[in-house]
Amino acid sequence: MSRIKRNAVSMACLLALLAACGGSGSDPDVKAGGATPTLLAGSVVTTQEPLVSASRIAGGMAAQEATAGAIPVLLAPSEARSRELSGTVPTAPGVTLAGASRLLSQASMGATMYDIQQVAIKGMVPWLNEQFAMPQLMHRWYIDNAMRKAGVGGWGTQDQFYESFWQQVCTGQDQLRQRVAFGLSQIFVVSFVDDNLGSSGRMMGGYYDMLGKNAFGNFRTLLDDVAHHPAMAIYLSFLRNKMETETRVPDENFARELMQLMTIGLYELNQDGTEKLKNGKPIETYTHDDVAGLAKVFTGWSWAGHDKSNARFFGTIEDPWRDWLPLQNYPNFHSTSTKQVLGRPLTATTAEGELKEALDRLFNHPNVGPFIGRQLIQRMVTSNPSPAYVSRVAAAFNNNGSGVRGDMKAVIKAILLDDEARRPGANAGGRVREPVLRQANWMRAFYASSVSGKYTMWSMDDPVRGLGQSVLRAPSVFNFYRPGYAPPGTALESADMVAPELQIASEPAVVGYLNTMKNAIYNGMGRNYDIRTGYVKELAIVADEDKLVDRLNLLLMAGQMTPTTRAHIRNAVRSIQMPAAWNTDPADISYRRTNRVYLAVYLTMASPEYIIQQ
């Protein structure tokens, strides 16, 4: 066993060096009050879900549109596992299994062997188009049903959101939407860490649903929905924001961050993302007068409802659906003075008109394509895209080929199908996999399922006892890490390169990751180890170390494991001898077989080659 320990320590040290340098038993729930359908794997259920239309509240009850959609089945992990093909897999022209796995590392929450085979068989573009056409399953439906089943009211809990989130990660077939929504959640940040949102599971679930809904839509609609969502209004403090007086100015928080972090950034950019210069200095995109003007646009906005009374504005009337319906404007509290945005006064004469004009102005700013495009590249493909890569993605944002600006499908295709994304070694070092994705990778790669059917997972943002990151629990509006972060005093900084995710890769976090994943691999994750995997496919080949390592290499590293790492892992696995033919002790046989798998998975996920997504 000493060799095993030496290898494990070796991998841990390498990871620390990197940080230093650098089937489901649950039925899918539908809307509250509706029947929970019994679903068979591969089937589709259709339901009616009321969604608020783009036309906002114009007095009276919020206008709603009933949108019918086919809900994708939450494919049971055991069913996905059973669909794996054995033997030679027929692949589409120009696609390899390793290439398919690499696409999934960028475009999903994690690869399964079944998914790898499907991408390889169908081809990358057909798979992307299939993902674009796949309907969305809402977290809010799950939370509503969870409260209904428990016989309680209220606003939902964090735990209920995480149950829904991890259920969708493990079993949802809409993997591209989930990955893009996760990326958007790190640009349009709201957080459970805020005391005012910590007990608002349904509101936050609805916000995440909104990001997912817009993941394949238009960026302009996304801006509108973010600006009207109560979670953002609470988080960046413009809910119940009142017009200016002689002694009071409107809250400027959201106005500032909407420009700085969510649309145009601090400095004017060329299409390739490089800064424009004037007299050798960067050119600021906005002034404080613009912040003050935009802040006045966000006055008078508060809860949706049947009327626009003062009581409803201040929230003393608590309608049961106000936590997810879009805000409405209350003229009694809206500023009527002149509002300057990006150097020019707004011309609209109503609150709704002013907001539309302001968002149009931001949306049409030439910075948006490169500013947002670069961040989405960082969240999916590489931390250091070349200027040419950024320019190509920005061009797709500016015009999808049919004269449409802000088409997210065009942007996503431009990101994922670019040569720098598809050609190994072309993307300047890839990116560090953030902890949430490592956790999701493990769950999906080994077909993890929930014992209870609820996927009871709490937040994992404690860096010592967890993974140092949980979705929707960023410490501030600046996310878990900044897009331009480089570890100080390192070769990365000297090379003018960035590694955003290393901002949370402290020494305790590195050790916490190793300990947490070791425990997960051996025992499972979540409350009472509710989320577990049987490693069925891995145990079937456990006697052949080469086949076992080959499978892990394809699943977790897209075939990019180096010969040195491969030899380390293979030798460590080999040091645990397979049970002899005469061994009839079932406990010893199981121990030897399972520990060979556990060790192989652990060392693979501890290796720097896995931590760095190439």
Question: For each predicted feature, which ranges?
Answer:
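Sec-dependent bacterial lipoprotein signal peptides
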Residues: 1-19
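Hydrophobic alpha-helical membrane-insertion signals
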Residues: 94-147
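Amphipathic interfacial helices
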Residues: 160-161, 171-179
